[in-house]
């Protein structure tokens, strides 16, 4: 067990869009430390978004993240030999973390051929409140609503 909690490191804003959120997306999409490939995937996806929507890609991306962010999640709590799924509020930092995780996971599951197209389409869908990642948020909220009776077990 740690003596102290590890300090959160601050990420640097990305060079093109000057956004920490884009840097976090790059870090999340990166595999085996290949940052260059991850950056090209994100930036190419943003170019596709610009072509398809004629809007600023960073605005579409931010709107998508806002639409995916969960406000409640379930945590399992063991009480008296029974496991309860207790709905808890999600901190702002964790909302962004979950939104990015879901966005990238559901982009990877799409049927298009190339990751840039998959990611661009998932971001566009999420900004329009459709797509797998938005469905995941809605399912999470539904489960939290269904288990509202156990909310008094919060800690």
From Swiss-Prot:
GO molecular function: rRNA binding; structural constituent of ribosome; tRNA binding
Keywords: Ribonucleoprotein, Ribosomal protein, RNA-binding, rRNA-binding, tRNA-binding
Assembly: Part of the 30S ribosomal subunit. Contacts proteins S9 and S11.
CDD domains: uS7_Bacteria
Pfam families documented for this protein: Ribosomal_S7 (PF00177)
GO cellular component: small ribosomal subunit
Ribonucleoprotein listed as a keyword: yes
Family note: Belongs to the universal ribosomal protein uS7 family.
Role description: One of the primary rRNA binding proteins, it binds directly to 16S rRNA where it nucleates assembly of the head domain of the 30S subunit. Is located at the subunit interface close to the decoding center, probably blocks exit of the E-site tRNA.
HAMAP family: Ribosomal_uS7_B
Protein name in UniProt: Small ribosomal subunit protein uS7
Organism: Mycoplasma capricolum subsp. capricolum (strain California kid / ATCC 27343 / NCTC 10154)
GO biological process: translation
Signal peptide: none
Taxon lineage: Bacteria, Bacillati, Mycoplasmatota, Mollicutes, Mycoplasmataceae
């Amino acid at each position: 067990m740690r003596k102290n909690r590890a300090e959160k490191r601050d990420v640097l804003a990305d060079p093109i869009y000057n956004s920490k959120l884009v840097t976090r997306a790059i870090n999340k999409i990166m595999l085996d430390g290949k940052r260059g490939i991850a950056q090209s995937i994100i930036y190419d996806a943003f170019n596709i978004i610009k072509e398809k929507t004629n809007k600023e890609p960073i605005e579409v991306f931010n709107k998508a993240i806002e639409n995916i962010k969960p406000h409640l999640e379930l945590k399992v709590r063991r009480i008296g030999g029974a496991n309860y799924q207790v709905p808890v509020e999600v901190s702002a930092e964790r909302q962004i973390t979950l939104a990015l995780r879901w966005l990238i996971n559901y982009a990877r599951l799409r049927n298009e051929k190339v990751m840039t197209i998959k990611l661009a389409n998932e971001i566009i869908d999420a900004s329009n409140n459709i797509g797998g990642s938005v469905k995941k948020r809605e399912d999470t909220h539904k489960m939290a609503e269904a288990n509202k009776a156990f909310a008094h077990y919060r800690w």
